[in-house]
């Protein structure tokens, strides 16, 4: 019981006294905000000029960056395709590069489907 009374007294004293630095921090932030914007907000013309300058700088930086091309190309991948000995539909182009959708061979007869195979050189 004595312990609970002690904690309650501590809680009440902490809430009453509070954080004295909190008011000082608020005042400091208000002063900084006033110093930053003491000239008032920018006019629309100034904002547009500033935006144009930023866009020009941005475009110059991106043009000189050699990594943008390689980054875009590294994410490119071929469309999904069927590998060797995988079923396909007659006349479809779903087989990977270098493979053709050919008539079923021995085991393909059982499944009645075509398979992606390398073309026979002849």
From Swiss-Prot:
Prodomain residues: 19-80
InterPro entries: Toxin_22
Keywords per UniProt: Cleavage on pair of basic residues, Disulfide bond, Ion channel impairing toxin, Secreted, Signal, Toxin
Pfam families the record matches: Toxin_22
Gene Ontology molecular-function annotations: sodium channel inhibitor activity; toxin activity
Tissue specificity note: Expressed by the venom gland.
Domain of life (superkingdom): Eukaryota
GO cellular component labels: extracellular region
Disulfide bond residue pairs: 81-96, 88-101, 95-116
Presence of keyword Zinc-finger: no
Localization of this protein: Secreted
Domain comment (free text): The presence of a 'disulfide through disulfide knot' structurally defines this protein as a knottin.
Name of the molecule in the record: U19-hexatoxin-Hi1a
The species this protein was found in: Hadronyche infensa (Fraser island funnel-web spider)
